[in-house]
């Protein structure tokens, strides 16, 4: 596993981002054959498998994709929407997105900027921590499958 070279306070967003990037890079180095992760479910709390949960390969590709954005910055909004939608958007979807965006703008004007920042900052911190754990679980599960458990 890669060692963090920068030192920030424990709960600093930069620390969480660095930790996430390091864990995903470690996952990429350990998982030599990603196709082995197809159709393997990540067990939930108590060892139970959730119905409809994504397989480990889906987690692997998602975690790598998010890591690229964490390391290199956001894609332009149009590229991101096209990527998510698979380049298939209809007029109705565009109208719904514009309506949703207008609603978000109205709500955001009502909240003060500091409260918005705190909400998004806490959410980002929580999500990155959760994704870091998922990357560790994918790595551990792959090691178990290939007999690399130490």
From Swiss-Prot:
<dbReference type="InterPro" id="IPR009786">
    <property type="entry name" value="Spot_14"/>
</dbReference>
<feature type="compositionally biased region" description="Acidic residues">
    <location>
        <begin position="90"/>
        <end position="104"/>
    </location>
</feature>
<dbReference type="GO" id="GO:0006629">
    <property type="term" value="P:lipid metabolic process"/>
</dbReference>
<dbReference type="GO" id="GO:0010866">
    <property type="term" value="P:regulation of triglyceride biosynthetic process"/>
</dbReference>
<keyword id="KW-0805">Transcription regulation</keyword>
<keyword id="KW-0963">Cytoplasm</keyword>
<dbReference type="InterPro" id="IPR053719">
    <property type="entry name" value="Lipogen_MT_Stabilize_sf"/>
</dbReference>
<keyword id="KW-0804">Transcription</keyword>
<dbReference type="GO" id="GO:0005829">
    <property type="term" value="C:cytosol"/>
</dbReference>
<dbReference type="GO" id="GO:0046890">
    <property type="term" value="P:regulation of lipid biosynthetic process"/>
</dbReference>
<dbReference type="GO" id="GO:0009617">
    <property type="term" value="P:response to bacterium"/>
</dbReference>
<dbReference type="GO" id="GO:0042802">
    <property type="term" value="F:identical protein binding"/>
</dbReference>
<comment type="similarity">
    <text>Belongs to the SPOT14 family.</text>
</comment>
<feature type="modified residue" description="Phosphoserine">
    <location>
        <position position="90"/>
    </location>
</feature>
<dbReference type="Pfam" id="PF07084">
    <property type="entry name" value="Spot_14"/>
</dbReference>
<comment type="function">
    <text>Plays a role in the regulation of lipogenesis, especially in lactating mammary gland. Important for the biosynthesis of triglycerides with medium-length fatty acid chains. May modulate lipogenesis by interacting with MID1IP1 and preventing its interaction with ACACA. May function as transcriptional coactivator. May modulate the transcription factor activity of THRB.</text>
</comment>
<keyword id="KW-0539">Nucleus</keyword>
<keyword id="KW-0444">Lipid biosynthesis</keyword>
<protein>
    <recommendedName>
        <fullName>Thyroid hormone-inducible hepatic protein</fullName>
    </recommendedName>
</protein>
<keyword id="KW-0443">Lipid metabolism</keyword>
<dbReference type="GO" id="GO:0140678">
    <property type="term" value="F:molecular function inhibitor activity"/>
</dbReference>
<dbReference type="GO" id="GO:0005654">
    <property type="term" value="C:nucleoplasm"/>
</dbReference>
<feature type="region of interest" description="Disordered">
    <location>
        <begin position="83"/>
        <end position="104"/>
    </location>
</feature>
<comment type="subunit">
    <text>Homodimer. Heterodimer with MID1IP1. Interacts with THRB and PLAGL1.</text>
</comment>
<keyword id="KW-0597">Phosphoprotein</keyword>
<dbReference type="GO" id="GO:0042803">
    <property type="term" value="F:protein homodimerization activity"/>
</dbReference>
<dbReference type="GO" id="GO:0032991">
    <property type="term" value="C:protein-containing complex"/>
</dbReference>
């Amino acid at each position: 596993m890669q060692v963090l070279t920068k030192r920030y306070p424990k709960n600093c967003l930069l620390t969480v981002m660095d930790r996430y990037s390091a864990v995903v890079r470690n996952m990429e180095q350990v998982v030599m054959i990603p196709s082995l992760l197809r159709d393997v479910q990540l067990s939930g709390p108590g060892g139970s498998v959730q119905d409809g949960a994504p397989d480990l390969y889906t987690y692997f590709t998602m975690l790598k994709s998010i890591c690229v954005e964490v390391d290199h910055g956001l894609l332009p909004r149009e590229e991101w929407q096209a990527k998510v939608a698979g380049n298939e958007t209809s007029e109705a979807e565009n109208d719904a997105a514009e309506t949703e965006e207008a609603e978000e703008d109205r709500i955001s004007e009502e909240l003060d900027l500091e409260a918005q920042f705190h909400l998004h900052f806490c959410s980002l911190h929580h999500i990155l921590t959760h994704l870091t754990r998922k990357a560790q679980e994918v790595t551990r599960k792959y090691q178990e499958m290939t007999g690399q458990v130490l």
